């Protein structure tokens, strides 16, 4: 009697089958299960990971990420010789985790290209398979509605609830039997180290929204340098954001929330010096946030957000608007 395969081998076999099934337009497509993509919560951003990144934003090949938005003119190519898109990526989820925010925002902003960036290998593999499965499901629904409109569309199995999630957590719009605006063609994800290579992907004033949801708090003082909010990184975010663009942050750690406010010069005894981050961002009022649908998605659609809700924890939100660049003195 042969011994059962090890857990790692089971996970590898499942991921290969899931990736292959997600690319097939026949048969029922199931969403990948997170339990087969588990990875430790931390990844050292200062390590030399084997990462692919473009020489500059003008060299980035987005055609494989957003095939539905590729420019039909084959002569339109970037500096790397790749096909250009009809529009630029405008929304970025830094540290996208398992992709809950992207999936939640996709039908809300169907004509806006959104990208998730994640450093963990198995997690980004899950997000890629999840998006591909969602696209295939939507294509099947679209095809079935046009070719056999008189018969009901086949039911699409819901993603099993994991990590103790309630049954309601699985019945999200992504498991709906009806078409979703955009068909999830406007979202994608890639593996990257934002702390090192963020400017390689996005040009000046390209983005309209940046999301930083439940980032690793790095509690130890010697680890604070690895936090994704800092003076230097805030300057890079400001470079990529359009004037009027928004940077969204949410955390369940109160100390980290105050860290965010301090590093945007919204709290503490820091003197606001000329040319500092205070000249680049202003905090958005609670009244404005109440009418922003993206805030509700950020609170409730991410996996971490759902976990905090189940545990009855607190969520601390701070959103900052990119100011227009000051005029040069005459």
From Swiss-Prot:
Binding positions (S-adenosyl-L-methionine): 95, 118-119, 193-194, 213, 302-304
Pathway: tRNA modification; N(7)-methylguanine-tRNA biosynthesis
Enzyme Commission number(s) of this protein: 2.1.1.33
Gene (UniProt): trm8
Family membership noted in the UniProt record: Belongs to the class I-like SAM-binding methyltransferase superfamily. TrmB family.
Superkingdom of source: Eukaryota
Catalytic activity annotation: guanosine(46) in tRNA + S-adenosyl-L-methionine = N(7)-methylguanosine(46) in tRNA + S-adenosyl-L-homocysteine
Polar residues bias (residue ranges): 172-185
Active-site residues, record numbering mapped to chain: 216
Region (Disordered): 1-27, 138-185
Protein name: tRNA (guanine-N(7)-)-methyltransferase
Keyword Cell cycle: no
Intracellular or extracellular location(s): Nucleus
MF terms in GO: tRNA (guanine(46)-N7)-methyltransferase activity; tRNA binding
Predominant subcellular localization, coarse grouping: nucleus
Gene source species: Aspergillus oryzae (strain ATCC 42149 / RIB 40) (Yellow koji mold)
């Amino acid at each position: 009697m042969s011994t059962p395969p090890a857990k790692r081998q089971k996970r590898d076999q499942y991921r290969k089958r899931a990736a292959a099934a997600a690319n097939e337009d026949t048969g029922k497509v199931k969403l990948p299960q997170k339990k087969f993509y588990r990875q430790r919560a931390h990844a050292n951003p200062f390590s030399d990971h084997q990462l692919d990144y473009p020489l500059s934003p003008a060299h980035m090949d987005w055609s494989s990420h957003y095939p539905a938005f590729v420019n039909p003119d084959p002569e339109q190519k970037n500096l790397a010789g790749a096909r250009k898109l009809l529009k630029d990526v405008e929304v970025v989820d830094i540290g996208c985790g398992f992709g809950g925010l992207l999936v939640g925002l996709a039908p809300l902003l169907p004509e806006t290209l959104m990208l998730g960036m994640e450093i963990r290998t198995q997690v980004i593999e899950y997000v890629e398979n999840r998006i591909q499965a969602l696209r295939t499901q939507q294509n099947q629904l679209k095809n079935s509605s046009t070719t056999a409109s008189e018969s009901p569309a086949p039911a699409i199995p819901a993603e099993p609830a994991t990590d103790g999630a309630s049954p309601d957590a699985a019945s999200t719009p992504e498991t709906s039997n009806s078409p979703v605006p955009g068909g999830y063609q406007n979202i994608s994800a890639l593996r990257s180290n934002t702390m090192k290579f963020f400017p390689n992907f996005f040009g000046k004033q390209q983005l309209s929204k940046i999301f930083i949801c439940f980032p690793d708090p790095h509690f130890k003082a010697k680890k604070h340098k690895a936090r994704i909010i800092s003076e230097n990184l805030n300057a890079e975010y400001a470079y990529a954001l359009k004037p009027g663009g928004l940077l969204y942050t949410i955390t369940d750690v109160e100390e980290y929330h105050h860290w965010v406010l301090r590093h945007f010069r919204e709290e503490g005894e820091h003197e606001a010096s000329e040319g500092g981050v205070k000249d680049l961002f202003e905090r958005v009022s609670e009244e404005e946030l109440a009418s922003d649908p993206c805030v509700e998605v950020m609170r409730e659609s991410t996996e971490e957000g759902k976990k905090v809700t189940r545990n009855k924890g607190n969520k601390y939100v701070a959103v900052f608007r990119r100011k227009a660049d000051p005029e040069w003195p005459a």
